[in-house]
Structure formats: structure tokens, C-alpha cells
Amino acid sequence: MNNPEWTLVLAFVWGAIWGSFYNVVIHRLPSGASLSRPPSHCPACGNTLKPWHNIPILSWLALRGKCGFCETQISIRYPLVELLTALLSAALWALVLQADGGTLVSEVGLLALVGPFMLLFAFVGALVVITFIDLDLQIIPHKITVPFILTGPIAAFWLEPITGLTWSTSVLGAIAGGAVIWLVIEGYFWVRKREGMGGGDFMMLAMLGSWLGVECIIFILLAASL
């Protein structure tokens, strides 16, 4: 355990597995469909996928991007979401390992960092799902943003040694994020007499503020103004 870098491979695999599930969430959540039933199946022929058809990234490559039954072309976005989530997971674990200059892991032990990593991974995973749903349908589901707005201050108790974010700055970030986007929405409506953003944007910025703090909101505003 003196060289925990080997666990980056585990973090990559962990992310790929969840990336496969996120593909299901992205496809089913907006319509209110069950995330567990029916099992993963080919949208063209309807056949339920075999376990070996559902191995993240590798199955798509082995099947050359086709259904294992009817050989209908399967979108490359499925393995890309899995790969993206795997890379984010590995990067996030590397960030956790380097917390406090890399001394935190030697002070508390590797296993003690798994919990904070899981919290951060859940947040990052939610952002992945939101991003692709927004790309597809131009909506940001409240089913995802609201729970993360509410849990941000609670998560801060465990994440403070890693992120430096306290529960109070988390609350302030959520309020600031929501207030800023509300002012933008109201200002746009006042000038243009029509809506420019929806309530989803309001919730999204509040969610980011809740988990990343006020500094994140300032950075987003500066980046958006460029």
C-alpha cells in the first residue's frame, strides 16, 4: 500500500462499469422509465444482451460496434460515455491521493479515502448524466440536481480535507449559484420579453455551487463572459 498508484487501474475499471449504467440512465430517466427493467437490450431487434455483450468499452470493440444478434450498428457514444467516466474516475482518485500534498493518504490510510472518493464520483457521475441528457433533449432533470443541492453541505463534512469546502461555504455556494442565474434569467426576460434559460439552469448552477463553492460560480461567470 506504500505505492497506491496501482489503484488507479481499479478506479478506471470502476468508472467504466458505472459509465455503462449511466448510458442506461441517460436513455431512460427523462421518460420516467425504470432503470432496471427491462434489462439492457438491442433497440433494433429487442434481444436481451448477454453478459459478454455488456462489458464496458471492450464489448463494443469486440463486436465492432454492432449488435451481437442482428448486427445493427450501435452508436459509438456508448463506449465513449464509458471511457469518459473511466478517465474521470481515475483522475478523481488521483486527485484524492494527492490531497494535502499527498500526505493525507499516509496519515489516514488508503481505505479512509474511499468514502470521500465515492462522494466526489457520485457528483461527477451526475454531471456526466446531466451533460448528455441536456445535449439530447435540452433539459436538466430536477431529479438529479435537487438531491445534490441538498446533499452538498452534508458531503462537505467528509470532503473538507480534500476540497477545502466547508458546509457553510457549500450553502453559500448553492445560494450564490441560484441567485446569480435567477438574476440572469430575470434580466434577460426584462430586456428581451422572453425566456432565455429554464429552471434547470437555475438548479444546475446551485448544484455546482453546493459542491464546489462560490469560487466555482465566479469562475463560471468569468469563463462565460469570454
Question: Where are the regions that the model predicts?
Answer:
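Hydrophobic alpha-helical transmembrane segments
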Residues: 1-17, 153-163
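N-terminal membrane topogenic signal
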Residues: 3-7, 73-78
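Membrane-interfacial, low-structure loops and terminal tails that flank and connect transmembrane helices
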Residues: 41-44, 66, 101-110
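Select subsegments of transmembrane alpha-helices in polytopic membrane proteins
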Residues: 76-84, 142-144
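Functional transmembrane core segments of multi-pass inner-membrane proteins
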Residues: 102-107, 111-112, 117-226
